[in-house]
């Protein structure tokens, strides 16, 4: 996990290692097989909603997510203009006139409903939809649940990946986030929750703006990791139906990341992942686990150690799936990302689903966080 933080802080632009393709003579059956593969390939869309969500998809466009269509959605025209995506949607043109939602989830919700037809058209044909946003503001908090409902009703496996605000951002954003999270759980198959406060336990001296970038990077790694286990050729890939089996009606999920380059790197990485501050739940009753293993030279014995360790720590009836991606840039490091589904989270409370009222009715101390 610390290596991930270091990579964000000291990121250097390098061209990815390219392995030359071996030229193989094509036959008529190869062409037919290619067509069949294209027809059965899972269509995965990633939708970034609001300022934080658009920051995340912008980063995804930089690093590349194999086999995914990237869509940016916002009420703020100026912010949307700066984002890189395969498709951009300015929602609520009549309601907000492109000026944003003003940290009001109700405006974000109404903006998405106003643009429902355009959103529906953009999601047409998707087998799986990731919705990513930072909860606590207006657009992401309000619009993401509407988009999740649309995607799920259209038959797509709908997975929301969201961050919760830092405590220092104030009670208003915390209450808004709670409201948005409840609605996302209602309308998504699975909601992966990343509490930003937990980043402070990983790297307490991290500058605030860098902390937001690290949060973005964790969102990116979660979506990219799951997607490419399906779409990108690797040492061990997952079938889309495997992922559906774990994440369909998966409820609340948490993520843990661990890494090690020691002699016992596999076991240490698995232990770090399950003891990650981000994995802030009791996983013993979890209904499912998705394990993403990556490294330059992962051995089968090491993969077995990781899988057995995770399996021992979740419910015996939990469905555990796993895959391995070869990443030369990790060198001697093994990285383990686990997504644990069907957990009971303290971030979901049985209170009434309403965002915090206006500042005049419920005063709170707010800290303005600049856009990154």
From Swiss-Prot:
Residues 350-360 have a biased composition (Acidic residues). GO terms for molecular function: GTP binding; GTPase activity. Residues 361-372 have a biased composition (Low complexity). Residues 350-372 are annotated as: Disordered. The keyword DNA damage does not apply. It comes from the Archaea. GO terms for biological process: FtsZ-dependent cytokinesis; protein polymerization. InterPro entries: Cell_div_FtsZ, Cell_div_FtsZ_CS, FtsZ/CetZ, FtsZ_C, Tub_FtsZ_C, Tubulin/FtsZ-like_C, Tubulin/FtsZ_2-layer-sand-dom, Tubulin/FtsZ_GTPase_sf. Keywords: Cell cycle, Cell division, Cytoplasm, GTP-binding, Nucleotide-binding, Septation. Pfam families: FtsZ_C (PF12327), Tubulin (PF00091). GTP binds at residues 51-55, 138-140, 169, 173, 216. The keyword Transferase does not apply. It is found in: Cytoplasm. GO terms for cellular component: cell division site; cytoplasm. Belongs to the FtsZ family. Homodimer. Polymerizes to form a dynamic ring structure in a strictly GTP-dependent manner. Interacts directly with several other division proteins. Essential cell division protein that forms a contractile ring structure (Z ring) at the future cell division site. The regulation of the ring assembly controls the timing and the location of cell division. One of the functions of the FtsZ ring is to recruit other cell division proteins to the septum to produce a new cell wall between the dividing cells. Binds GTP and shows GTPase activity. This is Cell division protein FtsZ 1. It comes from Pyrococcus furiosus (strain ATCC 43587 / DSM 3638 / JCM 8422 / Vc1). The gene is ftsZ1.
